[in-house]
Amino acid sequence: MSKRTEQLGHEIQRILGEVIQYELKDPRVGFATVVGVEVTADLQIARVRISVMGTPDERRETMAALERARGFLRRRLAEELNYLRFVPELRLILDTSVDYSLHIDELLRRAAEERADSPPQQPEDDKPAE
């Protein structure tokens, strides 16, 4: 990724985050956060990773509402990024990495609890000879 596409990705992330949080009035949009944007080298496509808190149904509903608002989001980007000739097409992607990390944390917590609850076992080699 070139420095230009990386900078543009950060700028798109900032703008979309603010627009989704403060300007989008759709009540179906739950707690959504733009966690990253990858812009193609030709600046035609921006893959926008979005994390949504809530149940699977709430996530689907939020992503569907954001898909319907894609035109509005792109129009707001065009207003903010007026130095670009073309505004990238937005591809909205549900990011589940936060869920995965929470799942891993839970597994590690359980393993630590199980280890604390079970008595330490003596290795076979350390047992006294009879």
UniProtKB/Swiss-Prot annotation:
Gene3D superfamilies: 3.30.300.20. InterPro entries: KH_dom-like_a/b, RbfA, RbfA_dom_sf. One of its GO terms (cellular component) is cytosol. GO terms for biological process: maturation of SSU-rRNA. It is found in: Cytoplasm. One of several proteins that assist in the late maturation steps of the functional core of the 30S ribosomal subunit. Associates with free 30S ribosomal subunits (but not with 30S subunits that are part of 70S ribosomes or polysomes). Required for efficient processing of 16S rRNA. May interact with the 5'-terminal helix region of 16S rRNA. PANTHER family: RIBOSOME-BINDING FACTOR A, CHLOROPLASTIC-RELATED. This is Ribosome-binding factor A. It comes from Roseiflexus sp. (strain RS-1). The lineage of its organism: Bacteria, Bacillati, Chloroflexota, Chloroflexia, Chloroflexales.
